[in-house]
Amino acid sequence: MTINDVSLSHHGGEEASVLLEELCDAYADAYGVEPGEEKTVAFRRRAEKQFSRPGFALVTARDGGCLVGFTFGYTLPGGDTHWWGGVQPEPTAEFLQETGSRTWVLSEIEVRRAWQAKGVGRALHDAALGARGEERATLATGPDAAAQPVYESWGWRRVGRIPGDEGDYYSAYDLFVLELPVSR
């Protein structure tokens, strides 16, 4: 299994809905949980909501017929600063401004365990962000997420921390930003 065995494909929201079961299975495998466990059920709910958001895009990675990883996200709507709500340290008003074409949220990037550390995540990341027309991308991680150094090595910079909502996995999240277009 090498990155050379993987093919990447771009999909919109309708196609993502058709692929939902496969996405849930890959998500569960990435985290080493059963598909019916709460973590996967919560992922399903989040994903279904995002499929219809403006600017939604999904990139899948397959080895033959097997979905080995995926990433997806959506564009923040104009005038909506909810994503940045409560971020500390507080950024400038200009930083918070959303136009509907400024910021793309990298919501999920998941790779099956057998395919981790083989370049699939980076390939998905670059394919998704390389196709974007926004000025920047953003993502949120748990404060102690093992992925943080990986994101930083890919050019992301931490801009602050936001409080989590009731029922979230974490009580707080670190927000990262990456200027687009991505260059390697």
Language-model-derived ranges and their functions:
Residues G36-L58, R62-G64, V68, F72-T75, ...:
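Active-site rim helix/loop that mediates acceptor-substrate recognition in acyltransferases
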